[in-house]
A protein has these predicted regions:
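Activity-critical C-terminal alpha-helical subdomain
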Residues: 424, 428-481
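C-terminal substrate-recognition/cap domain of FAD-linked oxidoreductases
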Residues: 231-232, 240-410, 414, 425-426
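Iron-sulfur-cluster electron-transfer modules
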Residues: 485-488, 530-718, 736
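Cofactor-cradling patches in redox/metallo enzymes
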Residues: 567, 635-728, 760-777, 782-872
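Cysteine-centered iron-sulfur cluster-binding motifs in ferredoxin-type domains/subunits
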Residues: 487-519, 523-526, 544, 548-568, ...
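N-terminal accessory segments
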Residues: 1-33, 57-65, 70, 297-316, ...
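FAD-binding subdomain of flavoenzyme oxidoreductases
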Residues: 93-96, 107, 112, 116-248
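Glycine-rich N-terminal segment of FAD-binding domains in flavoprotein oxidoreductases
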Residues: 22-24, 28-92, 105, 125
Length: 872
């Protein structure tokens, strides 16, 4: 019996503690490529009280405790074998205090969740923005004192922290700030008012001295104006002198420079400056003019500032160096080992040439190992620059990785021996720079020994309590008949950025992945599933029931792929894993039976083929020659026959000349979901041939899942292009509305509509506006969008037949989406997917809420008024 495991469960609950290998492999490293050991346990506490108990337990057992926020840094420091990982992402509550101009947040809150809510009231976090805000946690960002992109006027993260709640290694809870010892509930106003700046002790200490559980941070009003400038320069000296002048006159709010790496296409000049001006309207105009005068006086070349605007508002898409999102990282598998620190602005005149000389001198070795420069980016503060030196190499190449670490050491020695001071110290470069700090490093070690004598918190980070844990880069093993190998390269493209976890920019901490909300651990979300796939390819893990649970509990909603920074087709990775597991008999029982019924009966409901069109009154529509075919689908044909009937009546009203094939089989979506690719191919081929015989040129679909299978999956499975145009019925209706040939009757007074974007219609087919064109055409009705809409829409939980094996997941997801719909004040919830419709009607029976659930096409059929019949 594992007594530690039992004690951890007593503290956090059984659902928030794991020691399963498939889970543990997802918590061994951050965005860096160097794996550490495999932890023994992962815990997800929900409160400071639970953190205290966990820390005390680890201290008593002298068990290493590694802190896990969102793990989006490039610390490149792995955990110790058998350690406890403290995943703090469930502690994500926050409270805005606009009167006192602060926000109180728990450690796991995502920065952008706070900022998204603040913006609704005209406020923003005082800490400047940047790409990391989309996915980084409050506690982690403060612990590492992250240096954001806009530090010129606003400073670094720690400059805006008012107070902290910290759990020390012995379990003592410390509150810093002016209200630290106040028993009346007053908030902290000043950080160092009680004497020593205790908050500063933990800011930047990388979790080695205590666990940050809560933080109070400053906020500010959003400026009236945000303007942008983009200049390039031929000479390094001119660029640096321009920056010094901009800094001395405080003319730009933020200054960001590029001094190496790829340049935007079609841009003249060797060096780049991006300037952001944020201020009152009149002052912003003056500051912008001052920036222009300075840049021009140093021979700057004005460029289109749209690149700067995109850099600032959409930084993680790397617009600076691209014509479109993601192309900059498109050649990954690559890892970016960072060497970063502060240096005097004028020192760039020496440091940049020195870096270039080093690269030139070692170019042959760089080429041999496929290395290249990502960039020499500089975020300028008031009087210095924060230089990032990033190099890229093939992450899956063991020799390239070893050489990459040597380059990191060389560059660290080059910069820190003369110009650079530590900033954003992380474990990746700590071995090369911490000894250079001399007595400062000794003092940090003394503090560590005093506060954490058992060295339980993040041992090895910052070279405190031992060396960093760097595991070997495992070589990919030779696959033995794995379908997964066909998408193997995709698993190495994952940047581990964490964009697949939530849609924090919507506000509040809104979830993105229903299976992650259900499964609790990273192995249930995109980043973790990719880590699982990679472990299988590298021979660290084998397919088994535990892996199957984590892959087949996915609804294939596509949210992770849609929000992936790298635009990785994660669904294709999951699909190959499903095919591998189907071949090994690991398909879950319920889905397996669905696949059997589908293959035997031509539908997933085990109904007879002869009953497929019992609902169709006008049988003359069957098997007639026509250019348009209506593909009904299994769910409308057997389960939601009213939707099928309403659809054909609507087609008749619109004057569409269409046919329905009596030999229509299931589209094959259930078979694909079950990993039965070859059987799915049979169905796809049959349906194609059936409609070819009827002279079809266009297929109209009611079910978006069927349409997605034909449009997206069929070409890949059969290796041939789709011979017909595909169109959803909502697209057809929307076009008729826009043409003026039809109109919709008015709705009763007080009708408020909201709409759920089905995953297949939205993210898979990118049909977002057609349903909204229809909804906005109902006179007398008000349309209130749910906060998560279009590409951000939360799955109802019914996708890929998940309910058959994971009913709790479906119920959870459906209920969450239902509550979001209720929050809009709607009287009617509309959707365009019969599976979603069924799920919401089941939720309605449980809640007894008055919110109606209505199929949009059925509503259109009832309300449509045809003014002109066109030949369709």
């Amino acid at each position: 019996m594992d007594e530690i495991f039992n004690q951890l469960q007593e503290i956090c609950g059984k659902e928030h503690v794991t020691n399963e290998k498939v889970d543990l492999l997802c918590y061994r490293r951050d965005c860096g490529p160097t794996p550490g050991g495999i932890p023994g346990y992962v815990c997800r506490p929900e409160s400071t009280e639970e953190v205290v108990k966990l820390v005390k337990l680890a201290n008593r057992l002298k068990k290493p405790l590694f802190l896990w926020g969102r793990a989006t840094t490039f610390v490149d420091n792995g955990v110790v074998n058998g350690s406890i990982v403290l995943a703090l992402d469930l502690m994500k509550g926050f409270e805005m205090d606009l009167q006192n101009q602060v926000v109180h947040a728990e450690t796991g809150t995502i920065w952008h969740a706070i900022d998204g809510e603040l913006k609704k009231s005209g406020w923003e976090l005082a800490a400047p923005g940047g790409g990391g805000m989309f996915s980084a946690s409050v506690g982690g960002t403060i612990a590492y004192n992250a240096v954001p992109h806009g530090i010129t006027e606003y400073g670094v993260t720690g400059d805006h922290v008012v107070s902290l709640e910290v759990v020390l290694p012995d379990g003592t809870v410390v509150h810093t700030g002016s209200a630290a010892n106040d028993a009346n509930g007053n908030i902290a106003i000043e950080r160092g008012a009680n004497g020593a700046d205790l908050a500063g002790l933990f800011i930047g200490s990388c979790g080695t001295l205590g666990v940050i559980t809560k933080a109070t941070m400053r906020i500010r009003r959003i400026p009236e104006v945000e303007d942008f400038l983009f200049y390039t320069f031929e000479k390094l000296e001119d660029t640096v002198d321009a920056v010094s002048a901009l800094q001395s006159q405080a003319s730009a709010t933020f200054i960001i420079g590029l001094f190496g790496g790829p340049k935007p296409s079609g841009i003249k000049g060797n060096y780049t400056l991006h300037m952001i001006i944020r201020d009152r309207r009149t002052t912003a105009k003056e500051r912008k003019q001052a920036c222009e005068v300075i840049c021009q006086s140093y021979n700057g070349i004005a460029q289109d500032p749209i690149a700067t605007q995109r850099y600032w508002t959409e930084h993680m898409y790397s617009w600076l160096r691209n014509d479109g999102p993601s192309t900059y990282y498109g050649s990954r598998p690559y890892y970016c080992p960072e060497v970063a620190g502060f240096l005097p602005t004028q020192a760039l005149k020496e440091a940049i040439p020195a870096l270039n000389r080093y690269i030139q001198d070692t170019q042959e070795a760089w080429d041999q190992h496929g290395m290249r420069v990502k960039g020499f980016d500089v975020y300028f503060s008031r009087n210095s620059g924060f230089l990032w030196v990033d190099t890229l190499y093939n992450e899956s190449n063991v020799e390239a990785h070893a050489y990459g670490l040597k380059v990191r050491a060389d560059i660290s020695e080059l910069l820190f021996s003369k110009w650079m001071s530590p900033g954003g110290i992380v474990a990746g470069i700590a071995p090369y720079i911490m000894p250079k700090l001399g007595t400062s490093f000794q003092l940090m070690q003394a503090l560590k020994d005093s506060l954490d004598p058992n060295h339980i918190l993040n041992p090895g980070v910052l070279m405190l309590a031992g060396d960093p844990t760097f595991g070997k880069i495992p070589e990919r093993v030779k696959p033995t008949g794995l379908e997964l190998e066909k998408t193997g390269d995709l698993t190495y493209q994952c940047l581990r950025c964490g964009f697949c976890f939530d849609v924090s920019w919507v506000g509040k901490n809104y979830a993105l992945c229903p299976s992650y909300e259900y499964g609790s651990f990273e192995s249930y979300v995109g980043r973790g599933r990719v880590a699982t796939a990679r472990a299988i390819l590298e021979g660290e893990l084998e397919y088994d029931e535990k892996v199957a649970e984590r892959i087949f509990s996915c609804t294939l909603c596509g949210s992770c792929s849609e929000h992936c920074f790298k635009f990785i087709d994660l669904r294709s990775v999951y699909q190959k894993m499903r095919e591998d597991m189907a071949a090994r008999g690991l398909t879950p029982t319920g889905l397996k039976q669905v696949a059997v019924d589908t293959y035997q009966q031509r539908n997933p409901y085990a109904k007879g083929q002869a009953d497929r069109f019992n609902w169709l009154k006008d049988k003359s529509r069957l098997d007639r020659t026509a250019k348009t075919a209506f593909f009904v689908g299994c769910t409308p044909s057997y389960v939601r026959r009213s939707s099928a009937s309403e659809s054909v009546r609507l087609l008749d009203k619109l004057g569409v000349d269409y046919t329905i094939a009596s030999e229509e089989w299931c589209c094959a979506h259930p078979l694909m979901s079950a990993g039965e690719r070859s059987k799915a191919a049979e169905f796809m081929h049959h349906n194609l041939e059936t409609y070819k015989k009827l002279g079809v040129e266009r297929m109209v679909f009611l079910c978006p899942g069927c349409q997605m299978t034909f449009s997206n999956e069929l070409p890949e499975v059969l290796g041939e292009s789709m011979p017909f145009e595909t169109l959803n019925l909502v697209e057809l209706v929307a076009e008729e509305i826009k043409s003026g040939r039809i109109e919709l009757a008015g709705m009763p007074a007080g009708t408020v509509l909201t709409y759920h974007d089905p995953c297949t219609l939205g993210r898979q087919l990118e049909i977002y506006e057609a349903p909204r064109t229809i909804i906005n055409a109902f006179p007398g009705a008000r349309f209130n969008e749910m906060p998560r809409n279009r590409r951000d829409a939360f799955c109802c939980g019914a996708g890929s037949y998940v309910r058959y094996d994971f009913p709790e997941l479906t119920d959870m997801a459906g209920m969450e989406r239902w509550k979001e719909a209720l929050g809009t004040g709607a009287t009617m919830l509309l959707t365009t997917c019969t599976s979603c419709l069924t799920e919401f009607q089941q939720v309605k029976t449980q809640t007894k809420d008055k919110l109606e659930v209505v199929d949009l096409i059925s509503l259109v059929n009832k309300q449509v008024r045809v003014k002109e019949v066109a030949a369709l």
